[in-house]
Amino acid sequence: MEAKLEVTGKEVIKPASPSPRDRLQLSILDLYCPGIYVSTIFFYDLITESSEVFSENLKLSLSETLSRFYPLAGRIEGLSISCNDEGAVFTEARTDLLLPDFLRNLNTDSLSGFLPTLAAGESPAAWPLLSVKVTFFGSGSGVAVSVSVSHKICDIASLVTFVKDWATTTAKGKSNSTIEFAETTIYPPPPSHMYEQFPSTDSDSNITSKYVLKRFVFEPSKIAELKHKAASESVPVPTRVEAIMSLIWRCARNSSRSNLLIPRQAVMWQAMDIRLRIPSSVAPKDVIGNLQSGFSLKKDAESEFEIPEIVATFRKNKERVNEMIKESLQGNTIGQSLLSLMAETVSESTEIDRYIMSSWCRKPFYEVDFGSGSPVWVGYASHTIYDNMVGVVLIDSKEGDGVEAWISLPEEDMSVFVDDQELLAYAVLNPPVVA
């Protein structure tokens, strides 16, 4: 079901108190992150106040929250963030649709409408670092709260930390959180001359295909079957992420090969949150920034690969990164070591199929409560040409045991992918969110 939204208001929300700093140093990883928003949409089916009161409370609490997350109210200037209190953009919209009807007949193509609208041709460098859009459904049936934050300063873990703090402030009137920013704690700052050398993320000249985003749901029973199939002597008990990512990569690779006269090498890049792998004395678990690393899996153009083989390589490479982190912590070289690892993939030839995979599982999306309960559903969308990439994002289902996979592929590959019977043996294409 397509959602037709009408924007009813747009304003800039500034921090309730002035920024305590003038600038925030960006790391070399921040600057290499693409000029895109990291975005999530929270859907709520119960609002205890009127839409006017709810919206006003969100604005007031956002202002208070920005006082703690003050860089998000700033703007990027060169190699740092100017903490100039320019503010975040707050957009309000309405739709006549009822939330239950929308979730029962979900049209994933319409989800981008719940994200902030960017001016045509506007450079990512000019975007606000934080944009919020609140959409009220018809007859008081629910509300969607979307949060988009620049990937130049935040990863998904940072976004969740921010939204939880904002929700707590809305619901309880205050938050006692102490916020720390990663800056160059892990990754070093770039040399001052490097700014002119950075590749532009403002151009879409390299985008030659139309990309399509689809949602697939893995129920717990099917995940158990898949894990059993993915098991091997070297990895007798795969994780659900290992099993699902391996299946998706195999099927996506097969879809690509079916559309190519000459098969290409395939590389899968799996992102990792290093907060979970470093002691809190180095960086707190809820530190704000891009604290990501990862590892790659490579297959030659003619290689055939089965799921247990992919899982075994997945586990081996993941453990290699974990061991590298432990060793580099002792020598205080963690940032340089992880950058070298990521450079292996970045330097790959452009004539390859590159798949960017990220697991958002175990992130507390469903704990985001603005005062009237947990979300009925958490959705994902991308909304600009800069988000066009072959990628996969995994998110927990509300019950926590199932997984929703959001998969972006070139249109011609997706038309084959959605009919892959090996995939459909374990996943359902876009089932209703509510019965």
Curated annotation (Swiss-Prot):
Domain of life, source organism: Eukaryota
Stored Gene3D superfamilies: Chloramphenicol acetyltransferase-like domain (3.30.559.10)
Documented EC number(s): 2.3.1.-
Localization, UniProt: Cytoplasm
Stored Pfam families: Transferase
Conditions for induction: Accumulates in response to brassinosteroids (BR) treatment. Induced by darkness in roots.
Keywords of this entry: Acyltransferase, Brassinosteroid signaling pathway, Cytoplasm, Transferase
UniProt GO cellular component terms: cytosol
Tissue: Mostly expressed in roots (particularly in the root elongation zone), and, to a lower extent, in seedling, leaves (especially in hydathodes), siliques (e.g. in developing seeds) and flowers.
Major site of localization recorded for this protein: cytoplasm
UniProt GO molecular function: acyltransferase activity
Residue positions of the active site: H151, D369
GO biological process: brassinosteroid homeostasis; brassinosteroid mediated signaling pathway; brassinosteroid metabolic process; regulation of brassinosteroid biosynthetic process; regulation of flavonoid biosynthetic process; response to absence of light; response to brassinosteroid
Transmembrane segments: none
Described purpose of this protein according to its UniProt entry: Monitors brassinosteroids (BR) responses and homeostasis, particularly in the root and hypocotyl in darkness. Promotes flavonoid biosynthesis.
Family named by the database record: Belongs to the plant acyltransferase family.
Name used for this protein in its record: BAHD acyltransferase BIA1
Organism annotation: Arabidopsis thaliana
Gene from which the chain derives: BIA1
